[in-house]
Amino acid sequence: MILRLPILIWSVTLVLAAQDTTYYQDSGEMKSIGLSIDDQRVGDWNFYYASGALSAQLVYREGSLDGKQQYYYPNGTLQAIEIWGQDALQDSAFYYHEAGALEKKGWYLNNLYSGIWEFYHPNGNLKRRGNYEQGTPVGHWQFFYEQGALWQEGTLVSGLESGPWQYYDDLGQLQYVGAFDQGKQIGLWYKYNRQGKKKKWKQFD
């Protein structure tokens, strides 16, 4: 019995340290529920709106978000799916409009947008698409009208337009071409008519 006593005491201590924890809104409705160990959230936690509807299903490890996280609108539709690692956004992520259509998708690296991201109109058509480096838009970007036709495209440097850009009407026909420098229009810009003929439009300093 003497040899087993330390094991018994340790077991009791562990049980006391790990416990289900429930928080409530001021109105008395449940706010969140999950497991805590030494006052740190661990495992699966559910969070709720004041209405009682589920707002999030989160996963913790030693008090930090870790793994797949899901968020919901008050009407119950899925709002977002994120991957966290050691309390930072990592890997793929998906966000949705309240009606259910995909709003945007892409990748995170240490809480910052990284790589290709795509954004969508509520009707499901692509809104814009481009690359990020350390959270900043760079490289070739395309923007689209709500009905799906290409609107404009060009290069971004540090989040600003740079070099040649092309603009299209809602039927997909080329409308304007010109250049940018650090987000400002420069040089001679051209305009295209319905027959596709180019003419000088405006000179920028």
Describe every region a protein language model picked out.
Residues 1-21:
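Bacterial Sec-dependent N-terminal signal peptides
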Residues 16-205:
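Glycine/tyrosine- and acidic-biased, solvent-exposed loop/turn segments at the edges of beta-strands
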